[in-house]
């Protein structure tokens, strides 16, 4: 745990929306009188019919979560129409293509026309309120148009990340019984084509065998690549939008009408369809976007996520657009054409707020500072981190090298299930500690419990629960409320269990230690894998590390470390470096954390969103690599063969 403290920067203090006194006052009100607090902030969005009820939630029994339940609104209206009078000609979306020479700016007025036309296409082909529409698109403006067009007519969108396999896509089509799919001929990532239409055709065949029939496929022409065509089923996007009216009235939606389903991996079985609804979700996404990122009118805001993940839903599309912001959508990858791409985009579009994942930060740190320092980055005012705990070494590099020590970092903790950020610093209010998500956002009541469910106070390690609802919370798992209760409310009765381990320090700051299934029990001691990974990465030779447990005859679990070295770091003597790293970890954490196995690897198995697939690493560490399951979602499946070949635990 980093002992360093970075006080709020003087510049941030002067200009931010929330200072520490305001944070403490608002937070107190939000937890002592949530009805009054959320009634006030619920009015940040426009309502066709104002709500009179605010909070109606119960984490016990059948678990029921309702916010603003008698209010009527529309998400698309809030993200577009209400801005037209005052900012119709302001840029809503900056699109930066995979190719660094291609970009596009879309104003709010243009966004309105594009969304209305697509909404009319959906209606023309029989899509109605409540129908599920699957969106399988790359990071192109049409992905945002598709989400907003669904919201406009009351259809429920299910966005499937364009890196997912046909099998994964089919599973998601079948689960929500979607009959309309929006895709592209191909996607482009790092200069390489991705066969989206072909994948869609395969997925539709798989779904048909499970008696779910897709009637229409609307295809965006992104590359002009050759695609197969099903007459009567397949439609070209450009032809369809040209054939309809450019205006479409937004459908009045009850606050608790579904907005979207987004599938997230369960620790067991098939993916879970997380369901978010209309009113509370938008209030929470827009409020967190404004205060966490200290968004001011005129800021250029860039979240590097993909719309296929919840971060893209809440912090590329819905939160920023509800706030009338200019949001940047990036089609490419951080290392194409080279490792300086992020910072070139920052300079090119004068980005003020930059939000990315620790995995990207660590990869770019491993490539060397010169890719960063050759850019100016003078417009950057705020940096953000999302997706997993950020190790202090990567935090320091991000702060010192990328941010030139003048941009606060908001290290945000949240989940697909939470709809928006739950624990985070606020740039003008929170002193920072590298690696800590710091304090709860307004209305969030974290609690740490031990394995028996007893509440533990003070500076302790425990299981992170949230004991009361907030407007952005998921309402259920689509079609499976029983599984929803079992997954989130049965482990600790009456509490939402996050599945994450957490440490609270003497200052009341929260440190996420990783998924509870990523917590090792070494000779009866709890150790978070994130902590050991952080120790390894603090060594000058190490770019990235992943740690898993494996069965150990004496200690119960042993510590197995996968280590990727810095670019250009050649290992003369593997055994000597293993000893050095082992000593380094002992020094950083203590003898209890001594690694049992260290395997050097050119890369780690990651999904295309940058998440490390720990399930695969655990299987290899256990020498059980015969049943690795679906590896089709990996960015580079070839990494797995190297890991198996060089495993340290061969029986």
From Swiss-Prot:
Entries under InterPro entries matching the protein: Ac_CoA_lig (IPR011904), ACAS_N (IPR032387), AMP-bd_C (IPR025110), AMP-bd_C_sf (IPR045851), AMP-binding_CS (IPR020845), AMP-dep_synth/lig_dom (IPR000873), ANL_N_sf (IPR042099)
EC supergroup of this enzyme: ligase
Gene: acsA
Processing and modification events after translation: Acetylated. Deacetylation by the SIR2-homolog deacetylase activates the enzyme.
CDD domains: ACS
Essential cofactor(s): Mg(2+)
Amino acids binding ATP: 387-389, 411-416, 500, 515, 526
GO molecular function term, any single one: ATP binding
Coiled-coil segments on the chain, per record: none
Domain of life: Bacteria
Organismal lineage: Bacteria, Pseudomonadati, Pseudomonadota, Alphaproteobacteria, Hyphomicrobiales
EC number annotated for this UniProt entry: 6.2.1.1
PTM annotation (N6-acetyllysine): residues: 611
Binding site for Mg(2+): 537, 539, 542
Name of protein: Acetyl-coenzyme A synthetase
Pfam families in the cross-refs: ACAS_N, AMP-binding, AMP-binding_C
GO BP terms, alphabetized: acetyl-CoA biosynthetic process from acetate
Known role: Catalyzes the conversion of acetate into acetyl-CoA (AcCoA), an essential intermediate at the junction of anabolic and catabolic pathways. AcsA undergoes a two-step reaction. In the first half reaction, AcsA combines acetate with ATP to form acetyl-adenylate (AcAMP) intermediate. In the second half reaction, it can then transfer the acetyl group from AcAMP to the sulfhydryl group of CoA, forming the product AcCoA.
């Amino acid at each position: 745990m980093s002992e360093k403290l970075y006080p709020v920067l003087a510049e941030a203090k002067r200009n931010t929306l929330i200072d520490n006194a305001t944070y403490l006052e608002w937070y107190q009100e939000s937890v002592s009188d949530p009805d009054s607090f959320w009634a006030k902030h619920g009015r940040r969005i426009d309502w066709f019919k104002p709500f009179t009820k605010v909070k109606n939630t119960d984490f016990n029994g059948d678990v029921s979560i309702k916010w603003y339940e008698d209010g009527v609104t529309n998400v698309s209206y809030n993200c577009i129409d209400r801005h037209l009078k005052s900012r119709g000609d302001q840029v809503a979306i900056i699109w930066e293509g995979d190719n660094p020479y291609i970009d596009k700016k879309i104003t709010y007025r243009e966004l309105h026309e594009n969304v209305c036309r697509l909404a009319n296409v959906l209606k023309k082909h029989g899509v109605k309120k409540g129908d599920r529409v699957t969106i399988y698109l790359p990071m192109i403006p049409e992905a945002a148009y598709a989400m907003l067009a669904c919201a406009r007519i009351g259809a429920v969108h299910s966005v499937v990340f364009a890196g997912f396999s046909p099998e994964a896509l089919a599973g998601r089509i079948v689960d929500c019984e979607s009959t309309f799919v929006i895709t592209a001929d191909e996607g482009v990532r790092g200069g390489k084509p991705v066969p989206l239409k072909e994948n869609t055709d395969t997925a539709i065949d798989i779904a048909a065998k499970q008696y779910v029939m897709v009637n229409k496929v609307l295809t965006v022409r992104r590359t002009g690549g050759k695609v197969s065509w099903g007459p009567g089923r397949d439609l070209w996007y450009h032809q369809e939008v040209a054939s309809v009216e450019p205006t479409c009235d937004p459908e009045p939606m009850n606050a608790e009408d579904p907005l979207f389903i987004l599938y997230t991996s369960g620790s067991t079985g098939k993916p879970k369809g997380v369901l978010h609804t209309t009113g509370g979700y938008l209030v929470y996404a827009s409020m967190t976007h404004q205060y966490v990122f200290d968004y001011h009118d005129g800021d250029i805001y860039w979240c590097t996520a993909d719309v296929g993940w919840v971060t893209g839903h809440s912090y590329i599309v819905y939160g920023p657009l509800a706030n009338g912001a200019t949001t940047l959508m990036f089609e490419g990858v951080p290392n194409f054409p080279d490792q300086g791409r992020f910072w070139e985009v920052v300079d090119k579009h004068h980005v003020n707020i930059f939000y990315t994942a620790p995995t990207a930060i660590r990869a770019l740190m491993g490539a060397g500072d010169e890719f960063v320092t050759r850019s100016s980055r003078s417009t950057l005012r705020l940096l953000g981190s999302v997706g997993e705990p950020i190790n202090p070494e990567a935090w320091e590099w991000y702060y010192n090298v990328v941010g030139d020590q003048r941009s606060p970092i908001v290290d945000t903790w949240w989940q697909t299930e939470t709809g928006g950020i739950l624990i985070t610093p606020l740039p003008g209010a929170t002193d920072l500690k590298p690696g800590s998500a710091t304090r709860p956002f307004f209305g969030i009541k974290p609690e740490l419990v031990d394995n028996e469910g007893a509440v533990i106070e003070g500076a302790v390690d425990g299981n992170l629960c949230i004991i009361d609802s907030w407007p952005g919370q998921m309402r259920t798992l689509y079609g499976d409320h029983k599984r929803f209760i079992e997954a989130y409310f049965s482990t600790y009765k009456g509490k939402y269990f996050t599945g994450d381990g957490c440490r609270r320090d003497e200052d009341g700051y929260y440190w996420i230690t990783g998924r509870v299934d990523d917590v090792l029990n070494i000779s009866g001691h709890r150790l978070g894998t994130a902590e050991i990974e952080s120790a390894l990465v603090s060594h000058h030779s190490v770019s990235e590390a992943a740690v898993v447990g494996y069965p150990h005859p004496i200690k119960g679990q042993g510590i197995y470390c996968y280590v990727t070295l810095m670019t250009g770091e050649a290992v003369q003597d593997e055994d000597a470096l293993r000893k050095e790293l082992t000593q380094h970890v002992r020094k950083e954490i203590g003898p209890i954390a001594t690694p049992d196995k260290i395997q050097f690897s050119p890369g780690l198995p990651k999904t295309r969103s940058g998440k490390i697939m720990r399930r695969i690493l655990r299987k290899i560490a256990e020498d059980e690599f015969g049943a690795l399951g679906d590896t089709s979602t990996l960015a580079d499946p070839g990494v797995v063969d190297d890991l198996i070949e060089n495993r340290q635990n061969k029986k």
